[in-house]
């Protein structure tokens, strides 16, 4: 089998080189030393480019931007977003066997417990789900955890974490890790096998991929799992820590060597993972176009990149919580480029190597005849539910006066991150930008100012409550020891309301921190009751303020504090209503 020959060849050459018997270049595999200080982050990246029987390995070990010693490609890394290609391949295999129709409703392949546990606003097809067009907003539960005991099963994940649909299916591309997990759940249900078992039986073993783990806990390959747990990962500041587990299984959970990734990539471009050539051809056929109606955008989950004059390259690239990975596939000549990294921070090496192998990037505008300055947001966002406030974090400003936005158009985040190409469209005075995995459209500056201002006011209310509680306790004790005969009746409501605001905001922050890392829906639901308490108690406080507090005889200072807390109570109610934090 061709992929096995490549694997044996790469492994043998690397081992001999590491033992010092031969240089890798003597065996026809080029080890490229790249001394460009393009990245100032600690960590390393490993690249494998395979074209026919020729394999080129580029190992970049970075310490403050300098290339150091050789790094073995047999080290274990997170595959990050490349994990999704195992899911897409599994779906295409079942489609090939006639067990799945890509244009049928996803619900036709779901078990009864899922149908009774999840109710989507609009129906969507398997193909729409593969192309990230099911309309889902971003997911904020069960993303990462450092404790494998916190991992949840795929059955529980797809029910507990079902996001709201904020777009009509088929109208907008919004990359969805949940959607990938739902596809895997479908594969699991149709094949009557656990997803990791299905992949091992139908992809890993046939290709000879022994150095890959699919399951979130990595118990399906304990040797690789142990190596992964011993590895180090680096953040933006060059600080390292232990690897995380991803409950977004299997969208982000796969770990393995870049060598195994290259074997999988070869299996895709050669069609070895499929029984029929027609299945491979369909897999590499564009299924979503850009707004111009001519430029390929997605091919059954894979992004379509434009290199050179007429060179369409398929694959994906992106970052996880602590790493980044990429895979590019040339279906015409069978060449592949794979990359894994133990640093989250993006850099320009990916762009450099991909263009070196496939040709210069094309299709990205160098300048624009019109001013596109303004505030924008991505389709990969949260705009519905208890954490809808996070939507403002997904907005950004483009200012043409500060320079042309070529970096934005090349990367999507106002910097040239991954070389993801995008297209700009102006229609009816509205600006829209499209990238492979998401759309970008204007965001109301007025709404941004309103929501941001409300956040600032809530922060001030929290600080006031934080101060008033200990001050109130001090005054209470002082009066107690001074034998104060008459305590203002309304003062107790004032202190209770201060405590309500304090815990309202404290639990609110706890929920946010938990939800954005490894929080569970159950935790969020429990914490959400603080919203009920906050809004009810705030209403009660306002009623008593009008009926009792404003009439009470007390100092001007104390009366002023009563009214300030009344403002804070009203703010809690407005904040809750605007951000849709109520559970009904």
Please place each PLM-identified region on the residue numbering:
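Catalytic loop of the DD-peptidase/beta-lactamase superfamily, centered on the K-T-G motif
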Residues: 31-61, 200, 242-474, 478-480
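Alpha-helical transmembrane segments of polytopic membrane proteins
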Residues: 454-462, 524-537
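Short, surface-exposed loop or secondary-structure junction motifs
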Residues: 33, 64, 118-331
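Sec-dependent N-terminal signal peptides of Gram-positive bacterial secreted proteins and lipoproteins
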Residues: 9-26
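Short active-site loop at a secondary-structure junction
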Residues: 67-128, 165-178, 249-252, 504-507
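Short, conserved catalytic-motif segment at the N-terminal edge
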Residues: 36-79, 99-101, 108, 156-163
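Juxtamembrane boundary at the C-terminal end of a transmembrane helix
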Residues: 575-584
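Juxtamembrane interface at the cytosolic side of transmembrane helices
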Residues: 464-502, 551
